[in-house]
């Protein structure tokens, strides 16, 4: 960017005027504001800060933008309305209309800033906000306040939360009273499912069965009935319900799951047709499709790699994106690619994948859809190959496993930052990164540096594998949820049963997705 070379404010203003839709507009306005402050022109700086959209700023500039806003004593409410997350520390100093408070609280709720949500909602129309308020209080472990909030809330979702809370407090009669008072059968099934899963996670499988049997017929009802009977050793009933789950399945993933578990039961029942269910599982999608395919010696990885549609032209947009990237502005390159989405060809997506695999996957999904030929062509790249192999050799971790975790954690985005403030390719939170760095004698200069992040992630995987004596499933669960939490769960010897009874859905899904990635990369890296 020419302005960055000489900091000429006249040039900067001319660029803003001539390129009103430029992807770097807000960043440029921020630089102009900083320079205006240095020149003593605080009014001009304030105008620029008020005009720009902080949501479009690069992550590294946002905290400085906030501090500059404070330094210039700009309107705290205006800042908060621009970005409730960034300006959440201003809540106590501002007055908002009910509509403004509700809109801001919804954004903060999605980002899990529950304390700020409570502060915003407590003065609003109770019945409009009671479910979000109660849920936030519960997340903050303020159980008594959450219970009282749900008791007074007329939102049907609150009744579901209340039924579960009563059950957890061992007030079973109140749970049953609520269930009998609800007319909506779908809501009743949702509550029964949650109560059943709660018992599955506690290892109370007979109690779980009692709840699942009261549900309306569905995939989740019969799959979890099958799971519970399987855990109790009643493989005949489990087999029956797993087959029923296939009947009610609505996705190829669900069908594979039901068929794989039916296969497990059929083996234990010594059925001659057991292998048929394994074959059916391999014809679906998802984690159990990968497991079944591997067991049958079939390929898991898609063979639609590097597919280019014959009727599409050579890449054009990719050239523009590459030029911006190579000029040192990867964030702007990504923004420019999405601006040009309509003109994007499959050739562009594949060309971009060599430069920025994260961007290529996102573009493929947005333009062509998940599972499309173009998506399959870029879905499992092998970037940072030398750095991955170096970490693999140093810590005796398969490259396939490092790639599998990296894909799920950041989708190969070196600049990724999660809601929990995990950073970089391997998504390490600060405390974990510092612990591993001290343990391994690694100096962290930049946590976003690909080599540093990959090395720390591989070292942490090695540490967890050693803790779990090579148990990959529990290692992955620990990478996501923490080893202390994983140790508190029922430790079923059957690895698949352990996965399906993980109490946290996010972790359960995480383990399956990383394992699926692992199967794919194990093939691609042979």
Please report, for each region that a protein language model flagged, where it lies by residue.
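"A position-specific structural signal for the A-helix of alpha-solenoid helical repeats
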Residues: 1-2, 31, 64, 68, ...
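Alpha-helical segment of the N-proximal tetratricopeptide repeat
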Residues: 2-5, 99-113, 316-335
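Structural motif corresponding to the intra-repeat A-B loop/turn of tetratricopeptide repeats
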Residues: 6, 39, 111, 140, ...
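Repeat-mediated protein-protein interaction surfaces in helical alpha-solenoids
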Residues: 7-18, 76-94, 112-122, 141-149, ...
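Short solvent-exposed coil/turn linkers within tandem alpha-helical repeat scaffolds
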Residues: 17-27, 51-65, 85-96, 123-129, ...
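TPR/TPR-like (Sel1-like) alpha-helical repeat modules
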Residues: 46-57, 70-73, 81-86, 125, ...
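Catalytic glycan-binding domains that act on GlcNAc-containing polysaccharides
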Residues: 116, 145-148, 169-172, 176-198, ...
């Amino acid at each position: 960017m020419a302005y960055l070379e000489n900091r000429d404010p006249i040039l900067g203003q001319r660029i803003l005027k001539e390129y009103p839709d430029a992807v770097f507009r807000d960043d440029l306005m921020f630089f102009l504001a900083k320079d205006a402050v240095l020149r003593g022109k605080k009014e001009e700086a304030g105008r620029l800060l008020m005009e720009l959209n902080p949501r479009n700023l690069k992550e590294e500039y946002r905290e400085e933008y906030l501090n500059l806003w404070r330094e210039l004593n700009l309107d705290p409410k205006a800042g908060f309305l621009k970005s409730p997350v960034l300006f959440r520390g201003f809540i106590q100093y501002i007055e908002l209309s009910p509509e403004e408070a509700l809109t801001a609280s919804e954004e903060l709720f999605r980002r899990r800033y529950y304390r700020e949500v409570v502060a915003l909602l407590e003065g609003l129309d109770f019945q409009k906000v009671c479910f979000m308020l109660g849920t936030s209080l519960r997340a903050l472990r303020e159980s008594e306040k959450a219970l009282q909030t749900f008791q007074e809330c007329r939102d049907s979702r609150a009744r579901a939360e209340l039924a579960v809370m009563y059950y957890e407090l061992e007030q079973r009669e109140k749970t049953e009273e609520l269930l009998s008072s609800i007319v909506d059968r779908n809501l009743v099934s949702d509550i029964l499912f949650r109560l059943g899963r709660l018992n599955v996670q506690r290892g109370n499988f007979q109690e779980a069965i009692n709840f699942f049997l009261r549900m309306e017929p569905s995939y989740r009802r019969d799959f979890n009935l099958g799971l519970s009977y399987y855990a109790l050793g009643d493989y005949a009933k489990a087999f029956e319900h797993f087959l029923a789950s296939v009947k009610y399945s609505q996705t190829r993933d669900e069908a594979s799951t039901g068929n794989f578990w039916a296969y497990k039961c059929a083996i234990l029942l010594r059925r001659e047709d057991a292998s048929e269910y394994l074959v059916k599982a391999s014809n679906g999608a998802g984690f159990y499709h990968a497991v079944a395919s591997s067991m049958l010696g079939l390929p898991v990885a898609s063979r639609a790699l590097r597919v280019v549609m014959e009727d599409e032209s050579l890449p054009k947009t990719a050239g523009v994106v590459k030029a911006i990237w190579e000029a040192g502005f990867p964030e702007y390159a990504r923004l420019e690619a999405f601006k040009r989405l309509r003109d994007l060809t499959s050739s562009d997506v594949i060309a971009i994948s060599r430069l920025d695999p994260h961007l290529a996957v996102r573009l493929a999904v947005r333009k062509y859809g998940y599972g499309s030929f173009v998506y399959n062509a870029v879905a499992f790249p092998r970037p940072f190959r030398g750095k991955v192999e170096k970490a693999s050799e140093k810590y005796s971790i398969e490259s396939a496993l490092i790639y599998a975790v990296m894909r799920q954690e950041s989708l190969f985005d070196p600049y990724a930052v999660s809601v929990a403030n995990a950073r970089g390719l391997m998504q390490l939170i600060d405390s974990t990164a510092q612990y591993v760095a001290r343990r391994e004698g690694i100096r962290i200069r930049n946590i976003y540096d690909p080599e540093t992040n990959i090395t720390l992630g591989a070292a942490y995987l090695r540490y967890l594998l050693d803790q779990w004596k090579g148990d990959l499933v529990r290692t992955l669960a620990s990478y996501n949820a923490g080893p202390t939490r994983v140790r508190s769960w029922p430790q079923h010897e059957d690895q698949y049963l352990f996965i399906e009874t993980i109490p946290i859905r996010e972790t359960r899904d995480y383990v399956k997705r990383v394992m699926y990635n692992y199967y794919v990369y194990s093939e691609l890296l042979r």
